[in-house]
Amino acid sequence: MSIHIAAQQGEIADKILLPGDPLRAKFIAENFLDDAVCFNEVRNMFGYTGTYKGHRVSVMGTGMGMPSISIYARELIVDYGVKKLIRVGTAGSLNEEVHVRELVLAQAAATNSNIVRNDWPQYDFPQIASFDLLDKAYHIAKELGMTTHVGNVLSSDVFYSNYFEKNIELGKWGVKAVEMEAAALYYLAAQYHVDALAIMTISDSLVNPDEDTTAEERQNTFTDMMKVGLETLIAE
C-alpha cells in the first residue's frame, strides 16, 4: 500500500490508463477490460486491473490538476513499478482547426505552473511525451480513422483563468489545446525514466464557443481516446 492507493503489490499492472474522472475509470473497466478487479477506492479514486485483448492493464482516476495527478502518478511509479502511463482526458481547443470530439496527442506540454520551476528555478525544463508511445498512438489513431492532432498543449494550474486572452494567443503559436495535467505527468516520467503520453478529447472550444459537450458525454463517451490509449499500451 501507498499513502493514497490501497492496492497490494502485484495488483496493479505495469501499464495504466489515467483518466482524471474516477467514474471514467469505472466506465473503462466495465466496458473495455475483461475480469476487471477494483484495487482502490480510497477517496473514491477508483482503480481497476483487468485484461485487454489478453494483456494485463490497469486504469485509475487521478483527479483534476497537476498536484493531484502528481500524487497518484508518483505512487504508481515509485511504489507499484508502473512503466507506461497514458492520460486520457478532456481539453479545450485553443486552435480553430481543432474541433470538439477530435483527438489531441500532446507531443509536449507548456505550463503556467511552478511545479517544474520549484525544482529547476534557473531552467525552462521541457515536458515532452514518450516518442515511442506518441508514435504508436498516432499511427493507431490514423488506422482507426480518427481525426487526430499532434502538438503542444498548455497545462494550466487555473481552470477559470484571468488570462483568457493570453491563452487564446497561445493558439496562434500552434498550441492545440488547454488542459490541467500533462506537464506534471511528463515531468514525473522524465524524473523516474518511464514512458508517458497524454491523449485528450476536445470537449469544448475557447475559439469556437458554440462547440461543447455535456457532462454525461464527457463521462460515458469519448471512447475513441480510450481505444487508442489501450491499443497503444499493448502495442509491441
UniProtKB/Swiss-Prot annotation:
EC main group: transferase
Chemical reaction(s) catalysed: a purine D-ribonucleoside + phosphate = a purine nucleobase + alpha-D-ribose 1-phosphate; a purine 2'-deoxy-D-ribonucleoside + phosphate = a purine nucleobase + 2-deoxy-alpha-D-ribose 1-phosphate
PANTHER family: FI09636P-RELATED, URIDINE PHOSPHORYLASE
Site description Important for catalytic activity, residues in chain: 218
Gene Ontology molecular function: purine-nucleoside phosphorylase activity
Organism from which the protein derives: Streptococcus pneumoniae (strain JJA)
Gene: deoD
Record's subunit section: Homohexamer; trimer of homodimers.
Protein name (Swiss-Prot/TrEMBL): Purine nucleoside phosphorylase DeoD-type
